[in-house]
């Protein structure tokens, strides 16, 4: 049985105390970009979510260089996803013996990097020209207007 060479590595950050929506705002900007471009984007973005994501990108690149021996120039973020984690629930004491709940949301972030020098399909896919779909004619003919019944009101 032939064993395929592994071309992807990942880094997983769990229970990061941040809203999943706020982390997705940053993750959507870096998905599909190269490693160097990702580092530059994350260092210049003004969001609090950038630092944990930057640490995960560094970790995924370190995993790629250690496990596969790949160079950082060949790495591309192939998949990046954010899932909601557990919610830490606490009670804050308030006046007159009442208490208000405090919900602290967490998230799980997964960064998957692909080495494009090891992946043969990536070179073939980028060299192929994207085909354009032909637009079908949407103009209605005389015969279609009366047969479909969509032209006239039925009052």
UniProtKB/Swiss-Prot annotation:
PROSITE patterns tied to this protein: RIBOSOMAL_L22
Alphabetical list of HAMAP family matching this protein: Ribosomal_uL22_B (MF_01331_B)
Family matches, as Gene3D superfamilies: Ribosomal protein L22/L17
Family: Belongs to the universal ribosomal protein uL22 family.
Protein's name according to its UniProt entry: Large ribosomal subunit protein uL22c
One GO cellular component term noted in the UniProt record for this chain: chloroplast
Subunit structure: Part of the 50S ribosomal subunit.
An individual GO BP term: translation
InterPro entries recorded: Ribosomal_uL22, Ribosomal_uL22_bac/chlpt-type, Ribosomal_uL22_bac/org-type, Ribosomal_uL22_CS, Ribosomal_uL22_sf
Function field: This protein binds specifically to 23S rRNA. The globular domain of the protein is located near the polypeptide exit tunnel on the outside of the subunit, while an extended beta-hairpin is found that lines the wall of the exit tunnel in the center of the 70S ribosome.
Molecular function (Gene Ontology), one example: rRNA binding
Coiled coil region boundaries: none
Disulfide bonds: none
Top-level taxonomic group: Eukaryota
Record localization: Plastid, Chloroplast
Source organism: Solanum lycopersicum
Pfam family, one: Ribosomal_L22
């Amino acid at each position: 049985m032939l064993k395929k060479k592994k071309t992807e590595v990942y880094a997983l950050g769990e229970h990061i105390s941040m809203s999943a929506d706020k982390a997705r705002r940053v993750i959507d900007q870096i998905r599909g970009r190269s490693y160097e471009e990702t580092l530059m984007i994350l260092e210049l973005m003004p969001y609090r979510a950038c630092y944990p994501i930057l640490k995960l990108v560094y970790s995924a690149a370190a995993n790629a260089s250690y496990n596969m021996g790949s160079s950082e120039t060949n790495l591309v973020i192939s998949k990046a996803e954010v899932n909601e984690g557990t919610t830490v629930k606490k009670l804050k004491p308030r006046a007159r013996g009442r208490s208000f709940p405090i919900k602290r949301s967490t998230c799980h972030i997964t960064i998957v990097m692909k080495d494009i020098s090891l992946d043969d399909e990536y070179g073939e896919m980028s060299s192929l020209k994207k085909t354009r779909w032909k637009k079908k004619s949407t103009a209605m003919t005389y015969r279609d207007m009366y047969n479909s019944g969509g032209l006239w009101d039925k009052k």
